[in-house]
């Protein structure tokens, strides 16, 4: 009877444990989808969801660091080379077989010489590759922009080539101690390992040829601009999905209540990323609201204001010190800007290339015009998308977290303002800017965005009237401005492609000059 009672009670306890586990799982699913946490499961769900998501974000941060670390793949290459060399050295090959005829056929001295030559050659090659890599970084920083160094450091083909060379060196060096004599006095030649070293030497030659080919193409300005443009457009698709229309109503952030607690920056640096999901889940579990007032990419000083947090609902009093601290754990501040959540940084990289090209040291206005063409692709996509702030609410509609994003006018200003000022003495650069504004206006749906475009057109016209003493240069820019204004004022008007836009403006300027000369005559 006692055993039967214990068995029944044990089954009941097991059933209740499984039921509680299902309830906790359901509560976690509901919280991750709607950020609504049942009171009975709030503490468990908060601990589980925030911990799991924080681990995911930490993995993302570590992965982003490893992608820009040059030492990671070569280190793996060394480990793989040592391990594979030790394993292949222990593989025996039966004498007289076809495989034996394909293997290395020399003496132990020959095998040792081959391994030494391959190792020494790889050390020299690694030094050359490192020198060429540093040279490419120097060219990128001096000719294009210092903010492009991160793009070069994240170049995977360069890291793979270095890993191949490091693997070959470690493999050949590690195989030297296996060549010698057996304890019984017989000669031992690791034929498989030596043959593998020769094979890796040929692979390294192919990798060196590919590296030179890739390096010569990677430092071309067109390749660099296209890479930055594609990464920026990828971030635009991530933050502003194409499913959102540009005429979607934009919400206005609420004003913090009187008892709101400020969120202060723990140290100085650039606001790199914000874990929106983590903060929303934390706010849902704690019944708080968090509001940031700083854009991602802005520089903040230690103790500077990042945002506000306050208690939601009818619960009186401001949040305790624990919630702001937990909230700030998901706000990442670093010493440099990144392209993880900062579209303006992608625009900044392209603008920096144009500014360096327009500098007196280079004086290359055509490169600046190419940059404007790439900028027009990004700005046109931004003009066609909704640009709402990242707002998270619970199922009842209560605000959980608000992350502000820059407005369309800000993105347009970043892409146009400095190029307009530094290219004020080159009419073709201003004409390219007007073509950009015309293409952007063609994709605008919101009337306020057309106002921003019209403002930039007016600034270009004012610059041309102030800087150009030659009538033909001024007329060329004013003709292009008239065409861009027509596209702004008449939605649906198609802008000419970049290749013909300057020709149309130049023809208009030439006609105006001829008419002026006829009048003077």
Regions found by a protein language model. Give the residues of each.
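Short, Lys/Arg-rich, polar N-terminal cytosolic tail immediately upstream
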Residues: 44-64
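N-terminal intrinsically disordered, cationic/polar leader segments
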Residues: 58-63, 88, 92-94, 102-104, ...
């Amino acid at each position: 009877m006692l055993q039967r009672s214990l068995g029944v009670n044990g089954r009941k306890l097991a059933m209740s444990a499984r039921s509680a586990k299902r309830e906790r799982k359901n509560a976690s699913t509901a919280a991750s989808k709607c950020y609504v946490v049942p009171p009975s499961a709030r503490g468990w769900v908060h601990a589980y969801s925030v911990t799991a998501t924080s681990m995911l974000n930490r993995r993302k941060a570590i992965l982003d660091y490893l992608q820009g670390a040059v030492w990671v793949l070569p280190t793996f290459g060394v480990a793989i080379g040592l391990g594979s060399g030790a394993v292949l050295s222990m593989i025996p090959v039966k004498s007289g077989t076809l495989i034996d005829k394909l293997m290395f056929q020399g003496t132990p001295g020959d095998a040792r010489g081959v391994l030494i030559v391959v190792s020494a050659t790889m050390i020299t090659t690694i030094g050359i590759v490192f020198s060429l890599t540093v040279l490419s970084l120097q060219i990128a920083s001096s000719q294009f922009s210092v903010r492009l160094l991160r793009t070069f450091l994240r170049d995977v083909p360069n890291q793979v080539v270095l890993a191949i060379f490091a693997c070959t060196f470690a493999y050949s060096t590690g195989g030297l101690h296996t060549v010698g004599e057996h304890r019984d006095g017989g000669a031992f030649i690791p034929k498989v390992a030596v043959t593998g070293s020769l094979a890796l030497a040929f692979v390294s030659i192919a990798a060196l040829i590919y590296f030179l080919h890739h390096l010569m193409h990677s430092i071309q300005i067109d390749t660099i601009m296209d890479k930055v443009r594609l990464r920026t457009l990828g971030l635009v698709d991530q933050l502003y999905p194409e499913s959102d229309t540009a005429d979607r109503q934009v919400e206005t952030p609420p004003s913090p209540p009187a008892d709101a607690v400020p969120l202060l920056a723990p140290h100085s640096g650039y606001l790199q990323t914000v874990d929106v999901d983590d903060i929303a889940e934390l706010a849902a579990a704690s019944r708080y609201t968090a509001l940031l007032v700083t854009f991602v990419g802005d520089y903040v000083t230690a103790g500077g204001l990042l945002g506000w947090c306050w208690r939601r609902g009818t619960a009186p009093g401001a949040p305790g010190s624990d919630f702001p601290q937990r909230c700030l754990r998901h706000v990442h501040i670093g010493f440099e800007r990144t392209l993880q959540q900062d579209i303006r940084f992608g625009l900044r990289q392209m603008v920096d290339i144009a500014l360096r090209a327009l500098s007196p040291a280079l004086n290359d206005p055509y490169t600046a015009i190419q940059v404007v063409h790439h900028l027009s692709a990004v700005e046109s996509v931004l003009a066609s998308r909704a640009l709402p702030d990242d707002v998270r609410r619970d199922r009842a509609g209560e605000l959980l977290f608000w992350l502000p994003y820059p407005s369309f006018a800000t993105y347009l200003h970043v892409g146009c303002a400095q190029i307009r000022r530094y290219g004020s003495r080159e009419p073709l650069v201003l004409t390219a800017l007007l073509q950009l504004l015309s293409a952007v206006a063609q994709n605008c749906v919101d009337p306020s965005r057309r106002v921003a475009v019209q403002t930039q057109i007016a600034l270009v016209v004012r610059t041309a009237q102030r800087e150009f003493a030659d009538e033909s240069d001024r007329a060329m820019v004013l003709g292009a401005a008239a065409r861009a204004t027509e596209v702004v004022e008449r939605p649906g008007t198609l802008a000419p492609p970049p290749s013909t836009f300057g020709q149309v403006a130049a023809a208009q300027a030439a006609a105006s000059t001829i008419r002026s000369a006829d009048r003077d005559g």
